[in-house]
Regions:
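N-terminal intrinsically disordered, cationic/polar leader segments
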Residues: 2-57, 61-112
Length: 112
């Protein structure tokens, strides 16, 4: 697995698009009464508050060109590889890992 070489501008665009996609999904879930998740974004950090009081944090890491995901199950680092954000440990795709964590923490199936 070789990370795609990104310029700083490309990284900021791609990471920003991912945060916006997560926010749009949460907004849709709230509108459709799927699940009550609160998303709070401050710059490159997005904190999701889930039912039961648990949290998931997505954080951009510009110096490393990574996305970091912190869940109740642990932390993961993601690099952009061949058109997708991939876990640096096992190559899992970011949205899959986020969906798994959100489903576990919300107690219902959720897919970003």
């Amino acid at each position: 697995m070789h990370a795609t070489t990104l310029t700083d501008a490309e990284y900021l665009r791609l990471s920003g698009e991912m945060l916006a996609r997560i926010e749009a999904t949460i907004d849709r879930w709230l509108q459709d009464d799927v699940v009550d998740i609160d998303g709070q974004r401050t710059g490159g950090l997005l904190e999701l508050s889930l039912p039961g009081g648990s949290k998931i944090v997505v954080n951009t890491q510009p110096p490393q060109h990574e996305l970091w995901l912190a869940t109740r199950g642990g932390g993961h680092h993601f690099k952009y590889v061949d058109g997708a954000w991939r876990d640096t440990r096992d190559g899992a795709e970011f949205l899959l890992r986020l969906s798994q964590a959100a489903s576990t923490q919300a107690g219902k199936p959720l897919a970003f």
